[in-house]
Amino acid sequence: MSTANAQPLYLRRRIVNVVALLMSCLTALFGLFFLGWILWTLASKGLAGINLDLFTKMTPPPMQEGGLANAFFGSAVMCGLAIAIGTPLGVLAGTWLAEYGNFRKAGTVVRFVNDILLSAPSIVLGLFVYTLYVMQTGGQFSAFAGALSLAFIVLPVVVRTTDEMLRLVPSQMREAALSLGIPQWKVTVQVLYRSAAAGIITGILLALARISGETAPLLFTAFGNQYWNSNVFQPMASVPVVMNQFAGSPYESWQVLAWAGALVLTVFVLLVSLSARGILLRNRISHD
């Protein structure tokens, strides 16, 4: 191709590249604009309700002052139970997929089912637990039922993370440990888990960040409670459900609490996400 013919082609490619880059930047700015708008609205309305009463008083009746102490407690209990239930099962299932089911048909089936569960709407999981547990206990809503529905959200995230992280561990580490006569289970626990710990912990934190804002499954399981309750087999308040109730009410005091709860929840999710990224970054730096 002569220089005269190559020049227009080069110019056209440059123009296409500049246009594509410009469109990408505009799209990114468009998304950041609305994200900033949402965060600004959340901060401007939520800060008005941030005070000591928010964390020390219970949800109030209409047109009275109060806080979200019982809702914060309920969310902490249900999220903690969900992590406690979903994490061990997810780690064990992910370990089986990575170490034993990698080249088996059963492993392919489990991965397929896990992917379906990973993308399932949370309200479907809530209805499943409602049918499986709540209806079988005489329609008794409870924090435990809410934790079960959240555990079904945690489970596929931890399974996928554990599977991926263990498969990233170099096979030479497995072979070196096995060549020393170490049993397979010790290789998994003492070698593989240590190498993949940062990634697995990151997955658990991301699962926690996801379930902390879930509302739909709790509407069918934990329901809610206006009072302080520490019995996990009774209805219990949670921040997302209270926000859903208060935000749609005509009472200004409830709306202020809903905005404040949304701000606290957003900050919590942000801190958890930053912690997860910090763990991954520190692990990457230590390996480099």
Predicted regions and their residues:
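Periplasmic/extracellular loop-to-transmembrane helix junction in inner-membrane transport proteins
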Residues: 3-26, 40-84, 103, 245-256
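C-terminal transmembrane helix and the adjacent membrane-cytosol boundary/short C-terminal tail
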Residues: 20, 97, 101, 163-167, ...
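Interhelical loop and adjacent transmembrane-helix boundary motif
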Residues: 59-66, 218-266
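Transmembrane-helix boundary motif in ABC transporter permease subunits
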Residues: 82-114, 127, 135, 276-285
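Transmembrane alpha-helices
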Residues: 83, 161-162, 182-220
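Amphipathic cytosolic juxtamembrane alpha-helices at the membrane-cytosol interface
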Residues: 89, 102-107, 111, 170, ...
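Generic hydrophobic transmembrane alpha-helix motif, especially the helices
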Residues: 115-152
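Non-cytoplasmic
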Residues: 132, 136, 143-144, 150, ...
